[in-house]
Amino acid sequence: MIRVEDASIGTVWVTCLLAVGLYFIRSRLLSDQFAGFPSVNSRKPWEVLNVFAHRRFQQNGPEYLKAGFAKSPVFGVVTDLGPKLVVSGAFIEDFKDEKLLDHYRAMVEDFMAEVPGFESMFLGNLHNTVLRDVISVITRELDQFTLPLSDEVSTALGDTWSDSPDWTEVTLLPSMLGLIARVSSLIFVGEPLCRDPAWLETVVNFTIVRHQAILALHMCPAVLRPVLHWFLPPCQKLRREIKTARSLINSALEELRKNPPTDRFSSLAWVDAFASGKKYDATMVQLRLANASIHSSADLLAKVLINLCEQPGLIQDLRDEVISVLEENGWRASTLNQLKLLDSVLKESQRLHPITTGTFSRFTRQNIKLTNGTEIPTGTPVMVTNDVAGDAAIYPDPEVFDGYRYLRMREGADKARAPFTTTGQNHLGFGYGKYACPGRFFAATEIKIALCHMLLKYEWRLVKDSPHDMLTSGFASFRDPRARIEVRRRAPDPQEVVLTIK
């Protein structure tokens, strides 16, 4: 193997030029792969690399998707994750046979899963088994987690939002990230690490830095990425975050092995026992859990709170529902399933403002023929989008936030599709099929618990003139991270005193 320090300048230059040439040829072949399909945001004739098209899509993704769908339900586009054949979610059923699709290759291409520092997506068969099984255990044991999660939410909100009866200003998204990171970590790593500021900062930063590093690598020719990732600042920063996490996890594991827990579940302890001495990377397992859960849940929670600020009348209806259901049933996972209006508000927020419109990324293993007759060739990078969420034929007034939308659906023929955690062809917020988000039941539980505490114990309102518009980056959409709200502890009504909420 030729090391950079041993190679002559000429050798390095020739290697780089060959790599760029191969990248150019590969890019042209990918462009030809979309021949016969309408396209938007194609590389300009004078653009040798895709970097400019990547940046355009990152800055104006929704506009390019709108322009593409105006041409056809299937079209080619250079995205910030590379060239994709975008397909309307109306055809999601045509992709239900996973044997025809390559999920792993899509993860490798989209998220650089085989680059050092990005391995949290895939770590071999043991790690995939561990992650699948630990999520199954968490889902199965949600009832036993409900009270501990409620206690942690109560304490964390007191720290984050304070218990002052006076209006206190907070920046919304950071406060939600801190809350969700702490509550999730109670189940993921247990006490006391779940409250360690260094751990909480690391798991929040990891996803942000990882996303920045992925986008940076997508700007580079694919053949140069195995070298360039060692030098790109976002990639170097990502490895520093992993190093910090590894130190914290190793210390926690050492303590766990000395004093095994007997009365409280944590995935860190469970996974260590499950591995039964087999070699595995506990740090990357935990970072994968954090990457999949913290930002998506915090994002949805922030969007819900702003939606409620804009429709304050809905808050009292939600508050009344929480009081009624908790008085009758107490804190149990099954109780949360009875909060049907709250469930509707969550699903409507996700429908109107999904964290990403690109919900289903695959490579085709074989030619796939859509129900409209369109044939997609083997080896095509496909992105099925959640555009059906804005289809007026499915959702009347789709651009309007209607917190009661899915509550009404429970009374009709489509009632089975109404629950927040239910996936289907008309709602792809949690993905679809075999690889639909397995952690959605835990996410729904912790978000509902957090909102119960907020509704019964706090009032909140937007700070006047605070920016809170929806912003986009590529396929992603999010509320302005500068959005600020004012919160204060509310005096409960007499009938609320009986509730077992701290």
UniProtKB/Swiss-Prot annotation:
Keyword terms of this UniProt record: Glycoprotein, Heme, Iron, Membrane, Metal-binding, Monooxygenase, Oxidoreductase, Transmembrane, Transmembrane helix
Official protein name in the record: Cytochrome P450 monooxygenase pyr9
The species this protein was found in: Aspergillus fumigatus (strain ATCC MYA-4609 / CBS 101355 / FGSC A1100 / Af293) (Neosartorya fumigata)
Protein's pathway: Secondary metabolite biosynthesis; terpenoid biosynthesis
EC number(s) stated in the UniProt entry for this protein: 1.-.-.-
Positions with a binding annotation for heme: C437
Keyword Transmembrane on entry: yes
Subcellular location: Membrane
Protein encoded by which gene: pyr9
This protein's record includes keyword Transport: no
Applications: Pyripyropene A and its derivatives have very unique characteristics of selectively inhibiting the acyl-coenzyme A:cholesterol acyltransferase 2 (ACAT2) isozyme. Therefore, pyripyropenes are expected to be developed as a new type of anti-atherosclerotic agent. Furthermore, pyripyropenes have been shown to exhibit anti-angiogenic activity against human umbilical vein endothelial cells. Finally, pyripyropene A also exhibits insecticidal properties.
InterPro entries in the cross-refs: Cyt_P450, Cyt_P450_E_grp-IV, Cyt_P450_sf
Function: Cytochrome P450 monooxygenase; part of the gene cluster that mediates the biosynthesis of pyripyropene A, a specific human acyl-coenzyme A:cholesterol acyltransferase 2 inhibitor. The first step of the pathway is the synthesis of nicotinyl-CoA from nicotinic acid by the nicotinic acid-CoA ligase pyr1. Nicotinyl-CoA is then a substrate of polyketide synthase pyr2 to produce 4-hydroxy-6-(3-pyridinyl)-2H-pyran-2-one (HPPO) which is further prenylated by the polyprenyl transferase pyr6 to yield farnesyl-HPPO.
Phylogenetic classification of the source organism: Eukaryota, Fungi, Dikarya, Ascomycota, Pezizomycotina
